[in-house]
């Protein structure tokens, strides 16, 4: 299985408001950058979208180390999702899971891959995290002019 590093970030100007996401894939010395934006979204939706789009860009099953600065995304996958699925996409408090559509899309995007999740503190000087933050901001700038 090919080893791939995936770095993701999402952000919003206003929450909700215009938002963007960025992803950086690195494999075998090659880097690929992805970005996108939406006019009316939330920070968490953009964080999820970055991970989904990064994984969807992989054309074959890979061993992925996915690094995010989003505790929401990392904890959702590593701690909460199993129970959400068992409880028909309800939280422990019996409320519907927010962003269910994107959590389900992320769950599907993960299936072909062997993914290890890593968390990094945002805006802490981590080079790749700073780059995907720049990509998310570029995407927002391009969307809003």
From Swiss-Prot:
Binds 1 Mg(2+) ion per subunit. May bind a second metal ion at a regulatory site, or after substrate binding. Mg(2+) 2 binds at residues 9, 133. GO terms for biological process: DNA replication, removal of RNA primer. It is found in: Cytoplasm. The keyword Cell division does not apply. Its main location: cytoplasm. SUPFAM superfamilies: Ribonuclease H-like. Gene3D superfamilies: Ribonuclease H-like superfamily/Ribonuclease H. One of its GO terms (molecular function) is RNA-DNA hybrid ribonuclease activity. PROSITE patterns: RNASE_H_1 (PS50879). Mg(2+) 1 binds at residues 9, 47, 69. CDD domains: RNase_HI_prokaryote_like. Its cofactor is Mg(2+). Signal peptide: none annotated. One of its GO terms (cellular component) is cytoplasm. Its EC number is 3.1.26.4. The keyword Nuclease applies. Pfam families: RNase_H (PF00075). Keywords: Cytoplasm, Endonuclease, Hydrolase, Magnesium, Metal-binding, Nuclease. It catalyses: Endonucleolytic cleavage to 5'-phosphomonoester. Residues 1-141 form the RNase H type-1 domain. Disulfide bonds: none annotated. Endonuclease that specifically degrades the RNA of RNA-DNA hybrids. Monomer. Belongs to the RNase H family. This is Ribonuclease H. The lineage of its organism: Bacteria, Pseudomonadati, Pseudomonadota, Gammaproteobacteria, Thiotrichales.
């Amino acid at each position: 299985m090919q080893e791939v590093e995936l770095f993701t970030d999402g952000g919003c100007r206003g929450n909700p408001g215009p938002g963007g996401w960025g992803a950086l894939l690195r494999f075998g010395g090659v880097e690929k950058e992805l970005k996108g934006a939406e006019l009316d979204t939330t920070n968490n939706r953009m964080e999820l979208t970055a991970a989904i789009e990064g994984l969807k860009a992989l054309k074959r099953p890979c061993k992925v180390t996915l690094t995010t600065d989003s505790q929401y995304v990392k904890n959702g996958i590593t701690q909460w999702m199993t129970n959400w699925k068992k409880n028909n996409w309800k939280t422990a408090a019996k409320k519907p899971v927010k962003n269910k559509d994107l959590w389900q899309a992320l769950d599907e995007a993960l299936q072909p891959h062997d993914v290890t999740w890593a968390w990094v503190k945002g805006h802490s000087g981590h080079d790749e995290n700073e780059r995907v933050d720049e990509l998310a901001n570029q995407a927002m700038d391009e969307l809003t002019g």
